[in-house]
Amino acid sequence: EPFQGEGGVNIPETHYLQGLRELCSQNDWLLMLDEVQSGVGRSGRWFAFQHSHIVPDVVTLAKGLGGGVPIGACLAKGAAAEVFQPGNHASTFGGNPLACNAALETLAVISDEGLLDHVVKLGDFLRNQFNRQLAGQKGVMQVRGQGLITGIELSIPCTDLVKRALEKKLLINVTSDRVIRLLPAFVMQQSEAEQIVDILCPLIKEFLNN
C-alpha cells in the first residue's frame, strides 16, 4: 500500500516508494501497489503513488472506483501487462456494464467537479484543526494523514470512541487499537468538516481525561 489504512494510517516518506521503485528496477522485479483504499482521489491525487513521483508496474483498485457500486480493477504496464493472455484468467462478472458505467461516471464527476482540490483543502483543514484543538492534550500522540484520510493516534486503546461518536451521530473507525481513522466522503462540505471537529475533539479530550 502507498500508505497503510488498516495498519494505522501510516504515510511513508517520499523516498520510501522511490527506494522501492529503484530496488525493483535494478533487480528486474515488479513493483505492485495496492491502491484499493488510497486510489481514485482519496489522497488528493488520482493515485497515492503520485505523491512520490514514481510509476509502479501493477496497481489494484476497488472501493472508490465505482462510487458505491462494487467494482475492482487491476492496472498493469510494460511486461506486467503481458503476463495474462486472452483466456488465461476469467471473471464471472468481469466487465459488468452497470459497474463499468458507474466507474466511468465516478471518474468524470471527480474530474469535472474539481474534487481532487476539494479533497486536499478539506483534509488539510481537518488535520490543522485537530492539531490546534488537541495541542497539549495528554495522550494524543500524533495527527497524520493525506487528502481525506486522517488518523489520530492516542496513547491507549480507544475502540470505545466508536460507540461514543455514533451516539453523537458521527461515524468513525479505530484501527490498530489506538488510531482513530476518518475517511469522509469526497463531497463533504466545509460546514460538515467543522462538525466533525466540534464533535470529535471534545470526545477525545473527555476520553483521555477520565
Feature-to-residue mapping (PLM):
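Conserved N-terminal phosphate-binding loop of PLP-dependent enzymes in the Aspartate aminotransferase
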Residues: 1-210
